[in-house]
Amino acid sequence: MTRVARYGKLVAQEGRGRELAELLLAAAARLEDEPGCELYLVNRQADAPDTVWVTELWRDQSALQAVLEQIKGSPETAAAMKLVAAAEMIELDHLGGKGPA
């Protein structure tokens, strides 16, 4: 199986970065028991407080797709998306490093 890594860059509406980050941190907590999610980190850009980065690592593409299907149309997803002014998702090939091997 090939792990799937992603960086998500989410720019919140002006002044709403903290609120967006809190919703994403709640999403991270809900993923604690999701075996296919190996890493879900939420970070705020130091020089741009309305920009939130999410770093994800998934067991494989099917694990990612299963979670995306679960959250599609959920109230939590809708609430977060209302705060997003711009978004970019960067797909990566996980090679290794410190953390999950």
Per-region residue spans from a language model:
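Short, well-ordered beta-strand segments in beta-rich or mixed alpha/beta enzyme
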Residues: V4-L10, L41-L68
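Glycine-rich beta-strand-turn "strand-cap" elements at beta-sheet edges
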Residues: T2-V4, L41-D50, E76-A101
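Short, surface-exposed ligand-recognition loops at beta-strand->loop->(often short) alpha-helix junctions
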Residues: V11-L20
